[in-house]
Amino acid sequence: MSRTTAAPNLTAGLERLLQLAAAQPLAPTCSHFFFLRHGQTECNAQRIFQATSEPLNATGLAQAQHAASLLADQHIASIVASDVRRARDTAETVAARHLLAPVLNSGLRERNFGKLIGTSSRDIDWGCEPDAGETLEVFIDRSRTGLAEALAQPAPVLLVAHGGTLYALAGLLGVGVERTLLGNAQPLRFDRHGAAWRVAALAASAATGTNLA
């Protein structure tokens, strides 16, 4: 597999990510928690692998405010965010409504795609091994550690991170994530039912919740 370009084996790469995560499952003790992907950036809009310094664009800033409104009535005791700028800024927007200070955790960062940063992500293959970047195994291990630390904070916890982090989380908990749940700044609620987890968009979480396993 090429180390300098993302090969077009999209399904296999994502399946590999989920398999690696499922092999070392996470077992949070909380009954529920929230997840929020960061607001949109220009690189998101253009589908380009982005650096950690990429800011939210105007759409992303508005999305963060809307997410804050959706989460305003939820009881949130802790907010843990990736320390990457786009996630940090999204978290701070939400945190202002709850009078909380986000805890930053580098373990929640998006996967480091190394020399692919600045190139098109339209044909992203999660199974690629980018030069100067993270292998899938390293990314999953880091994400698991960061998520375990984050979910050990006083509950309910709001995680603010990235699309890749969400995929890793889904694999670690044994749930699937439909593409409709991957939107920028779309609040999600994860609920534990016995040993199983369910995830739903916050607007739908008052209903049954979607078991996407």
What are these model-predicted stretches?
Residues 40, 85, 108-109, 164:
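Catalytic metal-binding/acid-base residues of hydrolase active sites
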Residues 93, 168-172:
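Active-site signature of alpha/beta-hydrolase-fold catalytic machinery across serine-
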Residues 70, 97, 149, 172-176:
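Active-site catalytic microenvironments for nucleophilic, acid-base chemistry
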Residues 81-82, 141, 160-161:
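Short beta-strand scaffold positions
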Residues 2-21, 25-98, 127, 131-134:
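Active-site-proximal alpha-helix that buttresses catalytic centers in soluble enzyme cores
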Residues 33, 155-163:
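Generic beta-sheet signal
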Residues 176-203, 208:
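Domain-level recognition of soluble alpha/beta enzyme cores
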Residues 43, 54-55, 96-145, 200-202, ...:
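Phosphate-handling substructures
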